[in-house]
Regions:
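Bacterial N-terminal signal peptides that target proteins for export
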Residues: 2-18
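Residue-level signal for mature regions of secreted extracellular proteins and peptides
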Residues: 21, 59-61, 87, 121-122, ...
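C-terminal motif of bacterial Sec signal peptides marking the signal peptidase cleavage site
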Residues: 25-27
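Bacterial signal peptide processing site
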Residues: 29-31
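Short amphipathic, basic-aromatic surface patches that mediate peripheral association
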Residues: 39-48
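Short coil-to-beta strand junction motifs in C2/discoidin
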Residues: 49-54
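Tryptophan-paired
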Residues: 57-136
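Compositionally biased low-complexity segments at domain edges in trafficked proteins
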Residues: 139-170
Length: 170
């Protein structure tokens, strides 16, 4: 059995180690974030007008070519996608068109950002961008495309997204 002062010293040392590990794990668990605005490029004005809203999903997959795999899995309805970092609610197309989409706080690092233009809650256009997000924030732009198996929606008489958003079309 240890004398009382020696037991107290060991206990204090043990508490110091446990406390230090707690601080280390807390620091490692907290990820730095930065503010980014997410935007899309539609293949045509007609396809932008045909879309109701855009959903963005941020995946944690820093491997090269991740977006191609994520895109193919999405359009073929496969479920084994990488871990999701952020899955905010969809943004109306008119909000994006007029710059009213709110910036999002995204974790710093390499991610894949999938954008899905929805029409009647169904995938219409899909795109993905592999990005390295830095502390400076900024804008991430994703090019959208019509997956091969998706039927074309009926075309609007509108000539601009602004007219469609302001209900100026017949």
């Amino acid at each position: 059995m240890c004398p009382a002062p020696l037991r107290l010293a060991r206990l204090l040392r043990l508490l110091g180690v446990v406390g230090g590990l707690g601080v280390l794990f807390t620091a490692c668990a907290a990820k730095d974030t930065a503010s980014f605005s997410l935007n899309v490029v539609f293949p045509s004005t007609a396809m932008a007008i045909a879309s109701d809203e855009v959903k963005f999903i941020v995946y944690d997959d820093p491997t090269p070519g991740a977006c191609q795999r994520i895109y193919l899995k999405r359009i073929s309805n496969q479920a084994n996608l990488p871990p999701v970092v952020l899955d905010p609610p969809p943004v109306p197309v008119c909000d994006l068109a007029f710059g009213r989409g709110a910036p999002l706080d995204l974790p710093i690092g390499k991610h894949s950002i999938l954008a899905i233009a929805l029409r009647a809650k169904q995938d219409l256009l899909v795109g993905c961008a592999d990005v390295a997000l830095s502390e400076e924030g900024g804008e991430v732009v994703v090019d959208l495309a019509l997956p091969g198996s998706t039927p074309l929606p009926p075309l609007s008489t509108c000539l601009s997204v602004r007219d469609a958003c302001q209900n100026r079309c017949q």
